[in-house]
């Protein structure tokens, strides 16, 4: 499901969600248009929870919004992905900017907690404060998607 980063949940989002529910289609949402004026990806996530009544968490955080949008932080790998080139088609991977590390840790913890509800191994690792492998996170995400 694609959501507008400015308008959030729109009438067609509700229609698409209704059809996805009807046919038991797992849902993964993308927040688009983060380079537009008034963009706020958190409104999209809040709308998914409040309007569509689904559990939603961020798996990426934008680096800048509107004309300052430069890339995203991957909360699974905990790396910053910058989109360079004339059309943003060249990906440059770097460490997370210092001014975004705290937010990245916060949203990663929310994501890990949410998807761990569907994977006992991951839940155990979280409770024991163990390092969580990327493969374990991917498995938990897959399980969370098919249990909607």
Which sequence ranges carry the predicted segments?
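Redox-cofactor binding/interface segments in oxidoreductases and associated redox assembly factors
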Residues: 1
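P-loop NTPase catalytic nucleotide-binding module
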Residues: 4-146
């Amino acid at each position: 499901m694609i959501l507008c980063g400015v308008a959030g949940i729109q009438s067609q989002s509700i229609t698409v969600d209704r059809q996805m529910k009807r046919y038991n289609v797992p849902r993964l949402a993308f927040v688009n248009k983060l380079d537009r004026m008034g963009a706020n990806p958190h409104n999209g996530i809040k709308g998914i929870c409040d309007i569509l009544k689904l559990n939603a968490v961020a798996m990426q955080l934008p680096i800048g919004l509107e004309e300052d949008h430069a890339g995203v932080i991957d909360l699974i790998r905990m790396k910053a992905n910058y989109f360079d080139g004339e059309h943003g088609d060249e990906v440059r991977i770097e460490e997370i900017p210092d001014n975004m590390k705290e937010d990245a840790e916060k949203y990663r913890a929310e994501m890990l907690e949410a998807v761990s509800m569907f994977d006992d191994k991951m839940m155990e690792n979280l409770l024991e404060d163990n390092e969580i492998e990327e493969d374990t996170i991917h498995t938990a995400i897959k399980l969370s998607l098919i249990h909607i």
